[in-house]
């Protein structure tokens, strides 16, 4: 997949949930373009690539800071530009972010004789962090637009451009201006580029599964079933095979238990903000439908939680109707379903933690012993507490 990605087009965008391997993919691309052949020993890339050229790589990661103010974003961009300028130099007339970025690209090309590789990880973090403040987000959007603008003008100097994020902001100029940008987020041929497939799990992680089974007093196949129920089930295109959450899977192997690791890292605040602002019946989430156009977030304001819930990994594709081009969405696995009830739903409907714990624990206990009538009554009671419309002023 990496070889195909780097040899069939120049500019790509990939959307995946947090902690799903996007940064590892970016680091892999960086190692490849830096010519680090030794890191690919024994892999398909070692034999596929014949030249192993070294390119100048400009790698920026927007996930490392909080961008709830314009000053924070400006400081982060300035810091990154200074790091590049220490390597390639700076002209006195380079005063704006766009001029400085453009000059770095040009000088890197001139000094190395090779086209430049630009890797931008979590490009949308600044917009998502400022989603609850429209004026701040508007300023941040303009700064980001200015910063990204040299990528179009510098096309002859660029070998490869790769952007990752959670959401695709459809009206951001970077998506309309970049030459031949390919959005591979929902393409079948790249659906498994992040995450772990069933085949990879059984072929590469057999020892881990055996140790997991032994630690939990179960058979190998029972461990596989538990892992699949807990961490599998992600689909990123209509014909995508099942994908495991890599963060949860590797944490489960490390700790030898089936816990909710993905949710333990915290629910993104932007998602809670969006859920609290939107008029959306969360009882309809499991099995809801969406068109492909709905997966793009508008650049001015996110008002529909559905695409964000999908792109954030709380919902995944369950089915696809090619006649109407409609996707059916559902929770991917037990970890997400349980985590949603415990984490997102209380934030959405403002339930106190004590009351939330009571509902969840009682519901699970009744379900385990087969008290289906009691389960239904608890669900009715729980959903009755949810207002039909949220008060956005609260």
Task: Describe the role of every protein-language-model region.
Residues 1-394:
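Phosphate-binding site recognition
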